[in-house]
A protein has these predicted regions:
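Glycine-rich FAD pyrophosphate-binding loop
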Residues: 23-48
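Conserved flavin/dinucleotide-binding core of flavoenzymes
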Residues: 4, 17, 25, 99, ...
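N-terminal Rossmann-like FAD-binding beta1-loop-alpha1 element of flavoenzymes
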Residues: 4-31
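Short hydrophobic core segments
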Residues: 7-9, 32, 233, 251-264
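Active-site/ligand-binding neighborhood in enzyme catalytic cores
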Residues: 129-232, 239-243, 260, 270, ...
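Conserved beta-strand-loop-beta-strand element in the redox core of flavoprotein oxidoreductases
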Residues: 237-252
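Dinucleotide-binding Rossmann-like beta1-alpha1 core, especially the glycine-rich loop
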Residues: 51-123
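Flavin (primarily FAD) binding-site architecture
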Residues: 259-278
Length: 455
C-alpha cells in the first residue's frame, strides 16, 4: 500500500494551499481530488467564441490579503470590475438609478437601509469570529433567523425587501433559513456588510484576467505527481497512530489527514470508527447555498451607452442580481446573473429552454428590448454539482453555532479540517479558503513535530 505523511482531501484552494505548505516544510503529502480538475468552487472556462465564463467564484477585494498575495506571487494579471455609471434597482415595476452600494432613489428606503447596514455591522463587530458561541447573547442570536430579525425592525417594506434580496445574494439562502448569529459571524468575517456588497474598495472590486480558477491551476502545477485527480474518497479508517484513506481507485496510508471540502461533503465520507454523534450533528446541520449562475453574452455592452454599470438588484423574476461581466480585452458585452436561494432551486427544476427564456425575459424587463437577442448563453447550477452540492458556501441552521460551533475546526484524532467554511477571516471567499489551508497545514506540521519529539 502506498504511504505518505499526510493525505489532503479536496483540490480547491484550501486543499491546494495546505498541500503546498506541507511540501515547503519537507513533509510528504498526497492530494486527492474527486473531480477531473482542480479549483473546487472556482471554474473558469473559455468558450468556443472566446468568451471567458466564470462559472464559480471570481472576485477579490481589499483586505483579502492572502489571495491577493498569491495572485501576485503566481504572476497573474487582474482588472477592475466595471462599475462606471449608475446602478439600477427594479422595485414595484419602477427603475430607480443610484450610485454606491445602497439604492438611494427612495429617500425613506435609503435612510432605512443605511440604518440597517450600520446596525448589522455594529452587531457583527461584537462577534469574535474565532468563537461566535462566546458572545454573551449567542444562544439568543442563534435562536432566531435573519427573517425574524428583519420582521422585528421598523424599516419600510421596500428596505426590508432589499435586505432579503441582499441575504439571498450573499449566502445564498432564504432569510428564514439562516441563523442570525451565523449571518453576523459572516459579516464580521468579511469586515462589515458594506465592504461585502460593494464593488469599489469592496469584495467585488477585482477579477483575475485569466479567470479565478487559474490560481488553482498554477498551484496544481507546483505539486507534480502529488496531485491525484478523479479520486473520490469513500472511507477513512483512522486510529491514534494514523489513517488509511480509501478512494475509488485504491488506498493510501498516512499519519495525518486534512479534509478540505465542505462540511456537507465531509459528512458523506464513511469513517471507521464513526465520527462522534455531536460531530455528525454538526455536518447534518450545515447546508450549502443554492445558486444558478448565468452568463448572457451580447455583441456589445449596450447598457453602458445609457449610463448603466450593469449592476442591478430586482424584486421580480428569477434573476435578481446582475453585474457587468464584460472582459476589458474583448468587445462583447456580458451580463452575469444569479438565481439565488429558493429561486435557484425552482430554476433547476425547469427545462433548459424555459430557464433560458425566463432569464432573457428578466433582462429585457431590466435593460430593455436590446437584451432580447443575446449571441450566447451559459449557465451552471452548483446545487447539481456532485462534489459541491451548492455554493457559494456552507451555512449553519439556527441553534448550531451556539451548541456545536466549537467542533468546527477541532481535529478528530489524526483528522484535521480545512475549507472556506472553517475560515475565521473572509469565510466563504477564496481568501478564506487559502487561510484555512495555511492554518490546517500549520496544525498538522506542529502535530507531526510533537510526535517526532515524543519518539
Amino acid at each position: 500500500m502506498e504511504s505518505t505523511d499526510v493525505v489532503v482531501i479536496g483540490g480547491g484552494l484550501a486543499g491546494l494551499t495546505a498541500t503546498r505548505e506541507l511540501m515547503r516544510k519537507g513533509i510528504s503529502v498526497i492530494l486527492l481530488e474527486a473531480r477531473d480538475r482542480v479549483g473546487g468552487r472556482t471554474h473558469s472556462v473559455v468558450e468556443s467564441g472566446g468568451t471567458l465564463v466564470e462559472h464559480g467564484g471570481q472576485w477579490v477585494g481589499p483586505t483579502q490579503d492572502r489571495v491577493l498575495a498569491l495572485i501576485d506571487e503566481l504572476g497573474l494579471e487582474t482588472f477592475t470590475q466595471y462599475s462606471d455609471g449608475e446602478n439600477l434597482q427594479y422595485s414595484n415595476g419602477t427603475h430607480l438609478r443610484y450610485h454606491g452600494a445602497i439604492p438611494t432613489g427612495d429617500p425613506m428606503q435609503a435612510a432605512d437601509l443605511v440604518d440597517a447596514m450600520v446596525e448589522l455591522t455594529s452587531k457583527a463587530m461584537e462577534i469574535d469570529p474565532s468563537a461566535p458561541w462566546n458572545h454573551p447573547h449567542a444562544s439568543f442570536l442563534d435562536s432566531m433567523t435573519v427573517e425574524t430579525w428583519i420582521a422585528s425592525q421598523q424599516y419600510c417594506d421596500g428596505a426590508k425587501d432589499w435586505i432579503r434580496t441582499l441575504c439571498r445574494a450573499l449566502f445564498p439562502a432564504e432569510p428564514g433559513e439562516i441563523s442570525l448569529l451565523h449571518a453576523l459571524f459572516y459579516f464580521r468575517s468579511g469586515g462589515g456588510v458594506e465592504k461585502m456588497i460593494g464593488t469599489i474598495n469592496s469584495a467585488q472590486e477585482t477579477r483575475v484576467s485569466l479567470g479565478a480558477q487559474e490560481i488553482s491551476n498554477r498551484l496544481a502545477q507546483q505539486l507534480g505527481d502529488r496531485l491525484r485527480l478523479n479520486c473520490p474518497v469513500v472511507r477513512i479508517d483512522h486510529s491514534d497512530s494514523g489513517a488509511v484513506i480509501h478512494h475509488e481507485h485504491g488506498s493510501i496510508a498516512a499519519k495525518r489527514v486534512i479534509v478540505a471540502i465542505p462540511l456537507v461533503l465531509a459528512g458523506r465520507i464513511r469513517y471507521s470508527p464513526p465520527m462522534s454523534g455531536v460531530r455528525d450533528q454538526l455536518t447534518q446541520r450545515s447546508f450549502m447555498g443554492s445558486v444558478l449562475k448565468v452568463h448572457v453574452v451580447y455583441s456589445s455592452p449596450f447598457w453602458r451607452e445609457s449610463g448603466l454599470s450593469g449592476h442591478i438588484t430586482s424584486d421580480t423574476g428569477k434573476v435578481q442580481i446582475t453585474f457587468d461581466q464584460s472582459h476589458p480585452d474583448r468587445s462583447e458585452g456580458v451580463i452575469v446573473g444569479f438565481m439565488d436561494s429558493h429561486l435557484g432551486r425552482i430554476a433547476t427544476q425547469m427545462s433548459y429552454e424555459d430557464r433560458k427564456a425566463e432569464v432573457i425575459a428578466d433582462l429585457v424587463r431590466l435593460l430593455g428590448e436590446q437584451a432580447a437577442n443575446p449571441i450566447a448563453y451559459y449557465e451552471k447550477a452548483w446545487i447539481d454539482e456532485e462534489y459541491s452540492r451548492g455554493a457559494y458556501v456552507g451555512m449553519m441552521t439556527p441553534g448550531t453555532w451556539s451548541t456545536l460551533g466549537p467542533l468546527l475546526r477541532e481535529p478528530v484524532g489524526v483528522i484535521h479540517w480545512a475549507g472556506t467554511e472553517t475560515a475565521i477571516i473572509w469565510n466563504g471567499y477564496m481568501d478564506g479558503a487559502i487561510r484555512s489551508g495555511e492554518d490546517a497545514a500549520q496544525q498538522v506540521s506542529s502535530s507531526l513535530s510533537r510526535e517526532e519529539k515524543i519518539k
